[in-house]
Design a protein with these regions (language model features):
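N-terminal export signals
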Residues: 5-24
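A mature extracytoplasmic/lumenal domain signature
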Residues: 73-74, 103, 122
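N-terminal secretory signal peptides
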Residues: 27-86
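Short, surface-exposed beta-strand/loop "edge" segments at domain boundaries and coil↔beta transitions
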Residues: 66, 104-108, 124-127
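Charge-dense polyanion-binding interfaces
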Residues: 86-119
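Short hydrophobic-aromatic micro-motifs
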Residues: 68-70, 118-119, 125
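C-terminal partner/receptor-binding element of secreted or periplasmic proteins
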Residues: 124-154
Length: 154
């Protein structure tokens, strides 16, 4: 291949390379949050692939900055209850806990303990709780949502 063809091929492939490099980028991640690789990362509790961007959650903290990813806020609620002895740092105020806002499709993240929740949305694991940024008619806080999830069981 001569020099002229090599340069022409490189110029022709540049837009393709730029388009492909943008494919993996999805959403703006809050400071400190580890990126969730949609359709590849799995929920630490149920081992399902995290696909539905409207219900994902993430927990991060401890001395080693451990990250736990969830496909459903309900899985996170049970993880917090079941693993409290193994990871006591999860109860500390410095622990970061995010949940995807239902209308944000993985683009908007809320602090899980400050978010409001609405029931009746079909979530991946059937806990059917969705996070919203502002209180709506019939919405409730994190503690009430937690009680609903634990009462449902699984």
């Amino acid at each position: 291949m001569d020099r002229r063809r090599f340069i022409a091929a490189g110029l022709a492939l540049t837009p393709l390379a730029a388009a492909l490099s943008a494919c993996g980028k999805s959403g703006a991640w809050p400071e400190g949050m580890a990126e969730i690789k949609w359709d590849r990362d799995t929920c630490v509790r149920c081992s399902m692939v995290i696909s539905d961007r409207r219900f994902a959650a993430e927990l991060r903290g401890g001395e080693k900055n451990i990250v736990f990813k969830f496909d459903d806020i309900g899985c996170a609620v049970f993880w917090l209850r079941d693993k409290a002895k193994d990871y006591p740092w999860m109860a500390e105020p410095a622990t970061r806990f995010w949940v995807s806002e239902i209308s944000g499709s993985g683009e908007k993240w809320l602090e899980a303990r400050k978010a409001k929740y609405t029931g009746g949305k079909m979530s991946p694991m059937g806990y059917n709780q969705a996070a919203v940024a502002f209180a709506e008619a019939g919405s409730f806080d994190f503690d009430e949502m937690r009680q609903h999830v634990l009462a449902k069981g699984k």
